[in-house]
């Protein structure tokens, strides 16, 4: 179904990069050695340091999606989960989701548009294999 997932997280100076990364890796059931991580240092509005992590996974992506989908159903019901997926899937059939970063660090999966972990599930294009 999905060929890759790209996960993007902004980590502020007051947050623990290790805790956030560990929580995310636990959720996606991967070790740090089995994912591609790009780390970008940047600054916030008031020059405060921010780290952006971009994590790319190109194998067994459906396992991650299925785990997320199952938890979405438990939280909001199957109809609402399907409606969310439909509303957040573009014409290329990429699915865009955002999870609450603080809740994720506590082992809870919750959809959120604020201070979120952004996940983009991508399908293979017509000419890719």
Q: For each predicted feature, which ranges?
A:
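Short glycine-/aliphatic-rich beta-strand segments at the starts of folded cytosolic domains
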Residues: 5-9, 53, 119
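Mid-chain, well-packed structural core segment of small domains
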Residues: 63-98
């Amino acid at each position: 179904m999905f060929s890759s997932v790209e996960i993007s997280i902004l980590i502020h100076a007051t947050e623990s990069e290790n805790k956030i990364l560990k929580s995310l890796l636990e959720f996606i059931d991967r070790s740090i050695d089995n994912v591609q991580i790009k780390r970008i240092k940047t600054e916030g509005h008031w020059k405060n340091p921010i780290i952006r992590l971009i994590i790319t996974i190109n194998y067994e992506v459906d396992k991650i999606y299925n785990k997320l989908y199952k938890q979405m159903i438990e939280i909001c019901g199957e109809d609402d989960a399907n409606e969310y997926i439909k509303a957040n899937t573009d014409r290329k059939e990429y699915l865009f989701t955002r999870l609450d970063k603080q809740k994720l660090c506590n082992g809870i999966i919750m959809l959120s548009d604020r201070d979120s972990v952004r996940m983009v599930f991508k399908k293979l294009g017509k000419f890719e294999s």
